[in-house]
Amino acid sequence: MTLIPIVVEQTSRGERAYDIYSRLVKERIIFVTGPIEDNMASVIVAQLLFLESENPDKDICMYINSPGGVVTAGLSIYDTMQYINPDVSTLCIGQAASMGSLLLAAGTKGKRYSLPHSRIMIHQPSGGYHGQATDIEIHANEILRVKKKLNQIYEKHTGNSLKKIEGMMERDKFMDPEEARKIGLIDRVIAERTDIEIENIKVKQKVG
């Protein structure tokens, strides 16, 4: 069993204890860690919606360290990221594979980052089904439909052609952060927090 650290905070009403992840949510930081499945996705979606209700104009930062997981669970997080008003900055720590890489790429353009020793992997969806031939055909067609949809999402967020995406997704494609940047999955490789701060200043200067 993993022990989650508790943070004790002094307030005007006395001491208040938070688990470390809840305390970070107060700072608008969300963690997507471990396999992506329905229960975890529901928590992430709830956090995104809560932070939007708290302040619809302030960025949310999503840290990702995930091997991927269930496509429908991942897409529920993806759709919520696109649905809410705040920009969602994504940062890969460790790895972002499969659905994890899709969520990494789905961050707000210009605010998608990776730490230098992380690993990113993309591939086509997989699945299996046992049963009657007709049912197997139905599920095979569904996997192909999902594959097409995922390719279209990568196309939208990376700027690559659908044909190029299909080629890259044909087999497991492992990348270091710089390779991921070159194909548009992320915008920048960062080593220190100040790298993001400098980037934000540059963006503000361009807007101004």
Curated annotation (Swiss-Prot):
Single annotated GO MF: serine-type endopeptidase activity
Recorded GO CC terms: cytoplasm; endopeptidase Clp complex
Disulfide bonds: none
Domain of life the protein comes from: Bacteria
Presence of keyword Hydrolase: yes
EC number(s) given by UniProt: 3.4.21.92
Subunit structure: Fourteen ClpP subunits assemble into 2 heptameric rings which stack back to back to give a disk-like structure with a central cavity, resembling the structure of eukaryotic proteasomes.
PANTHER family assigned to the protein according to its UniProt record, in alphabetical order: ATP-DEPENDENT CLP PROTEASE PROTEOLYTIC SUBUNIT
Protein role: Cleaves peptides in various proteins in a process that requires ATP hydrolysis. Has a chymotrypsin-like activity. Plays a major role in the degradation of misfolded proteins.
Name of protein: ATP-dependent Clp protease proteolytic subunit
Source organism per UniProt: Wolbachia sp. subsp. Drosophila simulans (strain wRi)
Phylogenetic placement of the source organism: Bacteria, Pseudomonadati, Pseudomonadota, Alphaproteobacteria, Rickettsiales
